[in-house]
Regions:
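Transmembrane beta-barrel architecture of outer-membrane proteins
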Residues: 64-70, 84-86, 125-131, 146-148, ...
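Acidic/histidine-enriched, beta-strand-rich ligand/metal-binding domains
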Residues: 85, 94-98, 124-126, 137-148, ...
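Predominantly the C-terminal beta-signal and adjacent terminal strand-loop region
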Residues: 37, 194, 199-255
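Residues on the lipid-exposed face of transmembrane beta-strands in outer-membrane beta-barrel proteins
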Residues: 44-48, 69-75, 93, 130-138, ...
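Extracellular/periplasm-exposed beta-strand and loop segments of Gram-negative cell-envelope proteins
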Residues: 53-63, 96-128, 158-194, 225-242
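Bacterial Sec-dependent N-terminal signal peptides
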Residues: 1-37, 45, 247-255
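Short glycine/proline- and aromatic-enriched beta-strand/turn motifs that initiate or cap beta-hairpins
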Residues: 32-74, 252-255
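Short loop/turn motifs that connect adjacent beta-strands in outer-membrane beta-barrel proteins
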Residues: 32-39, 78-85, 139-146, 207-212, ...
Length: 255
């Protein structure tokens, strides 16, 4: 089992490397045959994140909601026929985690015997997230609307975490739960560095001398785990997943 999990970790690193190499090769290919651009813009972004953690053994969950905000930098390097090619990087604060769906065998809320109310538990984990995207767009270059897609690696640095529950962990109603996995309640994040793949799509509206307004939806799949995953460890998998909806405002520095 240990060798399998180590193999998964190596495969994740290989996946990140392949994606980064593909992005660099793709942009390099465009640069050799496209129309050169040298446009740089910076700005701010903000939005809402729906997140969960993919546990093995499984922990039933609903989405955890949280905010994200940060700074964005976009460099437009080429136009290849109708495709506008850019690099987009961000440094964001993100509040993510998981929210448990605690039910009994009849799919009803589990009532805590000590408090008399339905048990609730969520964990919030705050990160600095740093995605780097190959950004491909089609539409108006100077004034008007563009549609874009983007994909690339994302890295995360752990800041802190907090739990929110309405019961004493020592007095859980474990007998009525359809899922009895509760080890996570006493475990803090063990791996402080997160990495994975992100991809998204959206629209951008540009107004000369005013700036660029972007609206997008994005998905992130973590290739690392928040807990150790050797044969001796409890969880074999504990990777983060995010659905992000955000707006970005950029203004030109070079054009």
């Amino acid at each position: 089992m240990t060798s399998v999990r180590r193999g998964n970790s190596k495969q994740s690193v290989k996946t990140i490397s392949v994606v980064m190499a593909f992005l660099l090769v793709s942009l390099s290919s465009f640069s050799q045959i496209g129309e050169h651009r040298n446009d740089l813009s910076i700005g701010i972004n903000g939005g809402y994140i729906l997140s969960n953690v993919g546990f093995t053994p499984k922990v039933p969950q609903n989405f955890h909601g949280g905010m994200t905000m940060g700074v964005s930098v976009k460099y437009v390097c080429e136009k290849y026929f109708t495709t506008i090619c850019s690099l987009l990087g961000e440094i964001n604060y993100a509040s993510i985690g998981w929210k448990e769906d605690i039910k009994n065998a009849q799919e009803q809320p589990v009532i805590n015997t000590a408090t008399g109310v339905a048990e609730k538990y969520s964990r919030t984990i705050n990160y600095i997230q740093m995605p780097l995207f190959a950004h491909l767009a089609w539409g108006k270059e100077e004034r008007g609307m563009q549609f874009f897609v983007q994909a690339g690696p994302q890295f995360g640095l752990y800041l802190n975490e907090s739990s929110d529950s309405n019961f004493d962990i020592e007095k859980i109603n474990i007998d009525d739960r359809s899922n009895t996995i509760v080890k996570q309640y006493s475990m803090k994040v063990e791996r402080k560095f997160d990495y994975g793949i992100a991809a998204g799509a959206g629209v951008e509206y540009s107004v000369p001398k005013v700036g660029h307004f972007l609206l997008e939806a994005r998905y992130y799949y973590g290739l690392g785990n928040i807990y150790h995953d050797s044969k001796r460890d409890y969880f074999g998998k504990s990777n983060i997943g995010n659905i992000v909806m955000k707006m970005t405002y950029l203004f030109d520095i070079l054009h």
